[in-house]
Amino acid sequence: MAAPSMKERQACWGARDLYWRCLDDNAEDAARCQKLRSSFEASCPQQWIKYFDKRRDYLKFKEKFEAGGFQSSQSTENS
């Protein structure tokens, strides 16, 4: 498989960005963004889609973690 051309990469990234923006605007409701998801899948290699999905999950986790949305499972009071 040949590497995607610059135009193909830009189309992929653009489709990804539109899909992610839709998810952000619709409280992660994937059903409302199905058309953009289909466009994203049609524009990007399958391996990239897997990577971008994992990347988004990580970025959302990191954002919540940094905002203090997670508590430590171990108590530090006894240390």
UniProtKB/Swiss-Prot annotation:
<dbReference type="Pfam" id="PF02297">
    <property type="entry name" value="COX6B"/>
</dbReference>
<comment type="similarity">
    <text>Belongs to the cytochrome c oxidase subunit 6B family.</text>
</comment>
<dbReference type="GO" id="GO:0005507">
    <property type="term" value="F:copper ion binding"/>
</dbReference>
<feature type="short sequence motif" description="Cx9C motif">
    <location>
        <begin position="12"/>
        <end position="22"/>
    </location>
</feature>
<dbReference type="InterPro" id="IPR036549">
    <property type="entry name" value="CX6/COA6-like_sf"/>
</dbReference>
<dbReference type="InterPro" id="IPR042289">
    <property type="entry name" value="COA6"/>
</dbReference>
<dbReference type="GO" id="GO:0005758">
    <property type="term" value="C:mitochondrial intermembrane space"/>
</dbReference>
<protein>
    <recommendedName>
        <fullName>Cytochrome c oxidase assembly factor 6 homolog</fullName>
    </recommendedName>
</protein>
<feature type="short sequence motif" description="Cx10C motif">
    <location>
        <begin position="33"/>
        <end position="44"/>
    </location>
</feature>
<keyword id="KW-0496">Mitochondrion</keyword>
<feature type="disulfide bond">
    <location>
        <begin position="22"/>
        <end position="33"/>
    </location>
</feature>
<dbReference type="GO" id="GO:0033617">
    <property type="term" value="P:mitochondrial cytochrome c oxidase assembly"/>
</dbReference>
<keyword id="KW-1015">Disulfide bond</keyword>
<comment type="subunit">
    <text>Found in a complex with TMEM177, COX20, MT-CO2/COX2, COX18, SCO1 and SCO2. Interacts with COA1, MT-CO2/COX2, SCO1, SCO2 and COX20. Interacts with COX20 in a MT-CO2/COX2- and COX18-dependent manner. Interacts with COX16.</text>
</comment>
<dbReference type="InterPro" id="IPR048280">
    <property type="entry name" value="COX6B-like"/>
</dbReference>
<feature type="disulfide bond">
    <location>
        <begin position="12"/>
        <end position="44"/>
    </location>
</feature>
<feature type="domain" description="CHCH">
    <location>
        <begin position="9"/>
        <end position="52"/>
    </location>
</feature>
<dbReference type="GO" id="GO:0005739">
    <property type="term" value="C:mitochondrion"/>
</dbReference>
<dbReference type="GO" id="GO:0008535">
    <property type="term" value="P:respiratory chain complex IV assembly"/>
</dbReference>
<comment type="function">
    <text>Involved in the maturation of the mitochondrial respiratory chain complex IV subunit MT-CO2/COX2. Thereby, may regulate early steps of complex IV assembly. Mitochondrial respiratory chain complex IV or cytochrome c oxidase is the component of the respiratory chain that catalyzes the transfer of electrons from intermembrane space cytochrome c to molecular oxygen in the matrix and as a consequence contributes to the proton gradient involved in mitochondrial ATP synthesis. May also be required for efficient formation of respiratory supercomplexes comprised of complexes III and IV.</text>
</comment>
